[in-house]
Structures are given as C-alpha cells and as structure tokens.
Amino acid sequence: MTRHQKRLAVPNSWPVERKTNTFTVKAGAGPHGEAGVPLVVLLRDVLGYVDSTKEARYALNNDSVLVNGDAISDEQRPIGMFDILAFPERGEFFRVFPDEGGRLALTSVDEEAAGSRLGKITNKSVVPGGDAQLTLHDGTNVLVDADTEYDTKDSIVVDNESKDVVAHFEYEEGALVTAVAGQHAGRIGEVADIDVTLGSGSNTVFVGDDEDGYETVEEYLVVIDENFTGDDADEVDSDE
C-alpha cells in the first residue's frame, strides 16, 4: 500500500499547500479517520521542525514528541481536532483547533493546559461489568461509571496521564460551542436555539445573537469552555 497521496486529494481540513509538491504523506491507521493529518506533516509543513520524514523518525525515536501525553513512534500517526502536541525538550505545547477556514491549526497553550484534551461524545454504551463506555469524536473510548450523566453531543475533558474525566460540558441552550465543519468552521458562540427536526434529519442550531450569529447543523458543533477558545494563545500557520 502506498505511503503517499496527491496533495489535491487530501481533506480540506489538512493544513498543507496543495499547489507545491504533487504528493504528501498518507495518514496511517489510527484516531480521527480520514480527517487525521499525519504527524510528519505538522512537524515539517506547519512547525518547520524537520525537513524530511527521516528527520521526523529520528525525533520520534528519541521520545521528543508527545501526543495526548504518549510518546509516538509512527510519523504517519493521524493527528486531529483537539489533540495535544507536546515538545517537552523545547518547552512547547500545542492544541489542534479548527481555524475560521475549517483547516486544522496549532494553537500554543501552556503546560498545564496541555495536560488534558477535549472530546465530543458521539456514542454511549454499556460494557460487560456494568460500566459505561463513551466513544469520542476521534474514535477513542473512555470508561465511566454507568450512573454518571453523560449524553451524546456533550463534551468531556480527559486527563492525559490518568485518562480520567476531569470536566464535563453539557450540550444545551446557553452552552459555548465552536463549529468544526461547514462554512462557519472556527466560529465560537453560545447556543441560542436548537430546532429539533422530526425524523432522521439533522437538528438546526442558531449560535450567537441576532447581529452576529450563525445557523448550522448540530453535527458541526462541539461544546467547549473559555479555556479552549485560544483567545490568549498564538496560532501557528503552515508555510504557504
């Protein structure tokens, strides 16, 4: 199986320039599905820390790159929305956050903020033993007590070291959300109204106020809090 794909064919969320080289690295198996960006692309094309896949492999083999608190050895490992990228030797930490164009961007955060990651609950099920299993937007699972009140569309914050849930944000009117897809991707605001659609259609949500609000479908929204807006952080852009 090829390890490369044409740049023109990559998802719109990838932070790469499509009109330079013909090919780029293909994402390997892992979280985030097809939307995941290979780690080497962020290291090379966005941060400029390496010039080649070979240099990326060397850095990874020396445990100098952590993703959600774990050392990563595969340069093709998919990186996606709300992942935490840490470079302990450099003292640099980043959160993956969608920009207003819908492309994934790296937002600089401090070490404390880098100790946990946000996840949107996409499914909840009961597993043998009676615990509840929460499936997050990136495909990872978290076990919690069955009697805890977590619902799909809510968001949780997971500690990168203990893997425990340390915060819970309910999806409801008044919740702070960000759009992660569609024409309003990257925009942040409070849920003003949820218009429930009967049948299998998507619910429509109005975010913000009448003057500067927007309407989108429910699936495009993720509940966050003020610590995830990036208001006080610097965004790293790819070289284009």
Curated annotation (Swiss-Prot):
Domain (S4 RNA-binding): residue spans on this chain: 37-99
Gene3D superfamilies: 2.30.30.30, 2.40.50.740, RNA-binding S4 domain
One GO biological process term: translation
GO cellular component: cytosolic small ribosomal subunit
SUPFAM superfamilies (alphabetical): Alpha-L RNA-binding motif (SSF55174)
GO terms of molecular function: rRNA binding; structural constituent of ribosome
Pfam family membership, one: RS4NT
Coiled-coil region list: none
Family per similarity comment: Belongs to the eukaryotic ribosomal protein eS4 family.
Name under which the protein is recorded: Small ribosomal subunit protein eS4
Naturally occurring in which organism (per UniProt): Halorubrum lacusprofundi (strain ATCC 49239 / DSM 5036 / JCM 8891 / ACAM 34)
Highest classification ranks of the organism: Archaea, Methanobacteriati, Methanobacteriota, Stenosarchaea group, Halobacteria
